[in-house]
Structures are given as C-alpha cells and as structure tokens.
Design a protein with these regions (language model features):
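Glycine-rich NAD(P)-binding loop of Rossmann-like domains
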Residues: 69, 121-131
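Domain-scale signature associated with acetyltransferase and cell-envelope carbohydrate enzymes
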Residues: 1-109, 132-133, 151, 167, ...
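A short, glycine- and basic residue-enriched loop/turn
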Residues: 129, 146-147, 168
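Conserved catalytic-core motifs of eukaryotic protein kinase domains, centered on the activation segment
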Residues: 112, 119-121, 147, 181-182
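Short glycine/proline- and charge-enriched loop/turn segments
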Residues: 115-122, 187-192
Length: 228
C-alpha cells in the first residue's frame, strides 16, 4: 500500500506541477521520482512514451533560458530514455530524436555560457545541438554546442563531443573520434517496446511488484533510521 500511495503522489505531482511547465507534454510520459525533475523555461517539449528516471541524489535538469538576447528551446522525441543526473541546458535549440537513450550524468549544452575573452558575455554565440533518432549516449559524456549526431550512433562513456558525428558509428574519447562503424540493418529501437507489446507498461508494473514483494513497511522504516 505504501508503494501505491507513493505512485499516486508521483502521478499527482507530475500532472499538476510539472506538466503545465512544458510547452508540449505527450501521452504516456513516464517520470520516476518526478519531484527530482527540474523544468526551467517555457520552450520545453516532450513527446509520447518518453521515460525519465530521476533520483534524490541525481535529479534531471531541463533548462531553456530566456532573456532579451536568447531564447532557449528543448525538444525531446518519442520513446526516449533519460537517466539520472542528466543535464540539458539550452540558450538556442537542443533537439533529441525518437528512441534516443541517454545514460547517467550526461551533459548536453548549446552554449559556452561565457565568452573566451569577455567573461561578462554570458551567452557567447550559442549553436544548436541536434541528436538524431536511436542514438545512445554513454555515461558522463558531454555534448557541446553545435554538435550533430547521426541516426543510430553510439557515444562512448566519458566522451567529449563537438562537431558532426556521422550516422551508424561509435564515437568515443576526448575529443571524441570514430572507433568503428555499425550495421544500420541490425538495430531494434526502444519504439518496439511500446509498439510491439500492448502490455509493456503492465509488464513493468508486474516486474516492480515482484521485486518489491519481500519488502515491508517496517523494513522501509529501518532502512531510513537504522541503515546497515
């Protein structure tokens, strides 16, 4: 019952406090721990069946800055996955394509936020970032302004990416460079989880129920006040 109560609170928080902050909010968007999602700015859109996983110590930060000089915009596609600790900050435009997966602690930005010589210039020529469909961005990667990542490509963990990344390749390193090519005919995207199974969301709930079955209210209290 405690989990059901928490889920009810999360749903209420998501639809009454977070949804109105989005320019567009698609259907069946799933946000785990929505109280740890920061949404700042008016021009932020999220499409159908997107999944955002937040955590108390690793919130997700979506910031589209608006001033007299800049108008940031963030567009998140269908079926995407964003993991804990991700920060997406825009002063121009950041577009993330359908079925893209973003691992933990990734930073995506379309601005340097300060000039090289004029440190009072807080916008410093932003350039749009475009991430195509079915891209996989590894943990702790940094995607810099002006970056374009082609469809199906993978960014290795800890990479720093700037410039144009072709489709169907693995890029990794600092600065990131091509490691290998990928076969574009072999991919199965996150979209298939939702379009090929009418019970996907119910299956997730069933898995969660089985995982939590051994837990109890007393055990939860002990974990907070008397952790091992």
């Amino acid at each position: 019952w405690l989990k059901q109560l928490f889920n009810s609170f999360s749903s209420f928080y998501l639809h009454h406090f977070l949804k109105p902050r989005f320019k567009h909010f698609g259907k069946n968007v799933m946000v785990l721990n929505p109280q740890h999602l920061k949404v700042f700015g008016e021009n932020i859109s999220i499409d159908d069946y997107a999944t955002l996983i937040c955590a108390p110590d690793k919130r997700i930060d979506l910031s589209a800055w608006q001033t007299d000089k800049i108008s940031g915009e963030i567009n998140l596609g269908k079926y995407i996955l964003i993991s804990p600790g991700t920060s997406i900050r825009s002063a121009e435009c950041i577009t993330i394509g359908d079925s893209t997966m973003i691992a933990s602690d990734v930073v995506i930005t379309d601005s340097d936020w300060h000039g090289i010589y004029d440190r009072t210039d807080y916008v410093a020529r932003p350039l749009p970032v475009t991430i195509a469909k079915n891209v996989w961005i590894g943990e702790r990667s940094i995607i810099l302004k002006g970056t374009e990542i082609g469809e199906n490509s993978i960014i290795g963990a800890g990479s720093v990416v700037s410039g144009k990344v072709p489709a169907n390749v693995v890029y990794a390193g600092n600065p990131a460079k091509e490691i290998r090519k990928l076969d574009k005919e072999e991919f199965k995207t996150r979209e298939s989880l939702f379009t090929e199974s009418s019970t996907y969301l119910l299956d997730l709930l069933s898995i969660e129920e089985n995982i939590l079955k051994p837990n109890s209210f007393l055990g939860w209290i002990k974990s907070i006040f008397w952790p091992k």
